[in-house]
C-alpha cells in the first residue's frame, strides 16, 4: 500500500528546473543575448543515474569534479554530458526564452522588472505542457541566487505566473538550491548553454543534440524595431 501511494505521488509531481545565461550588462560590452531555460521532467530520474555514474568515472580518474557546469567543463566532459542527455532526451521538455538585450528598453532592465517579465513569459510556454497542467504538485527549482533583490524578483515572477495558470488544487514548492546539489539544475545549465551559444556565436553543434525536445524557443523582441545601443 505504501509503495502504491509513493508511486502515485511520484507520477503526479512535475519538476521544473530553471537556468539563465548571459549577463546584465546592457551595453555594447555585455553579452548580446540573455537566455532563460526551463527543463521539465518527472521521476524516476534515469538521466540522473547516468550523470552520477559519469561523475564517479571522473572521480576514479583523479578528476576532482564537484558538479557539471557546461561553460567550465572541458570539451571531453561536455560531450559526455550531452551524450547522457541525448540518451534520455525523451524524458525532458525544454523551453527557452531569448532576449536580444539591445532591444530591452531602459525601464525594463532592473532585475525586479526584468525577471518577472521574462520568467512570466517563459513559464506560460512551460505550463502549456499537458503533464504540467495535469500535475497535482509542481516543484520549481532554481540555482541559488546570491542577490536578494534578484531572488525576490524571481520568486515574484514564478508565484504570479503559477497563480494565474495553475488549476485549483494544484500545489507547488519554489526552491533555491546550489546547482551542485541537483543534476536537474546541471541539465538545465547544459541546455541553456547550448541555446545561448547558438544565438551568441551561431554554433549549433550542441544545440542540435537537444533541439528535438526544445518545445519553445521564443525570441521575445523579434519584432522590435528599436535598439537602445
Tell me the role of every PLM-derived stretch.
Residues 1-229:
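Phosphate-ester processing/binding pockets and catalytic centers
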Amino acid at each position: 500500500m505504501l509503495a502504491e501511494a509513493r508511486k502515485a505521488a511520484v507520477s503526479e509531481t512535475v519538476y521544473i528546473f530553471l537556468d539563465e545565461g548571459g549577463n546584465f550588462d546592457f551595453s555594447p560590452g555585455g553579452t548580446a543575448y540573455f537566455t532563460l531555460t526551463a527543463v521539465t521532467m518527472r521521476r524516476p530520474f534515469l538521466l540522473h543515474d547516468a550523470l552520477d555514474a559519469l561523475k564517479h568515472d571522473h572521480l576514479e580518474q583523479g578528476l576532482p569534479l564537484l558538479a557539471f557546469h557546461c561553460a567550465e567543463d572541458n570539451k571531453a566532459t561536455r560531450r559526455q554530458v550531452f551524450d547522457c542527455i541525448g540518451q534520455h532526451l525523451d524524458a525532458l521538455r525544454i523551453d527557452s526564452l531569448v532576449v536580444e538585450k539591445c532591444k530591452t528598453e531602459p525601464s525594463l532592465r532592473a532585475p525586479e522588472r526584468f525577471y518577472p517579465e521574462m520568467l512570466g513569459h517563459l513559464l506560460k510556454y512551460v505550463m502549456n505542457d499537458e503533464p504540467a497542467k495535469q500535475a497535482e504538485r509542481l516543484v520549481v527549482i532554481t540555482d541559488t541566487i546570491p542577490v536578494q533583490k534578484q531572488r525576490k524578483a524571481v520568486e515574484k515572477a514564478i508565484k504570479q505566473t503559477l497563480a494565474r495558470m495553475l488549476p485549483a488544487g494544484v500545489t507547488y514548492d519554489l526552491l533555491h538550491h546550489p546547482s551542485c546539489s541537483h543534476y536537474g539544475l546541471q541539465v538545465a545549465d547544459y541546455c541553456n548553454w547550448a541555446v545561448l551559444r547558438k544565438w551568441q556565436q551561431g554554433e549549433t553543434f550542441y544545440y542540435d543534440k537537444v533541439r528535438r525536445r526544445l518545445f519553445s524557443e521564443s525570441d521575445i523582441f523579434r519584432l522590435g524595431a528599436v535598439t537602445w545601443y
